[in-house]
């Protein structure tokens, strides 16, 4: 997919119990213009099983030892092509429709600056 609007990096390590909810929250945004990248730090729990379950929705995923969350995010950044890049910790999730709202704001030519948390 060339130049998607959103790139979402999901760093993960032994968080399989949260990972499925996180991935579903991204997939259920119903946005086609998105790439999902999962960087797993070599988990020993069920994380890889969860990742494989959603593999068809992912642009890229890897499960290998890393040096922590910052390293995972940097690995994910190297795979991103989106105009807007976000990382979503695997124990967090997106509210329904949140990416649609962000996309609408960024496409509004009357808005010069937007800040949120």
Language model features with spans:
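Nucleotide-sugar donor-binding/catalytic module of glycosyltransferases
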Residues: 1-117
């Amino acid at each position: 997919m060339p130049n998607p609007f959103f790139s979402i990096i999901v760093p993960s390590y032994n968080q399989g119990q949260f990972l499925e909810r996180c991935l579903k929250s991204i997939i259920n945004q119903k946005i086609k213009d998105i790439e999902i990248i999962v960087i797993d730090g070599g988990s020993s729990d069920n994380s890889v099983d969860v990742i494989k379950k959603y593999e068809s929705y992912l642009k890229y995923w890897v499960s290998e030892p890393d040096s922590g969350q910052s390293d995972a995010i940097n690995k994910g950044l190297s795979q991103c092509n989106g105009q807007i890049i976000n990382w979503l910790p695997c124990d967090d999730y997106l509210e329904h429709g949140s990416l649609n709202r962000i996309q609408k704001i960024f496409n509004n030519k009357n808005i010069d600056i937007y800040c949120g948390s």
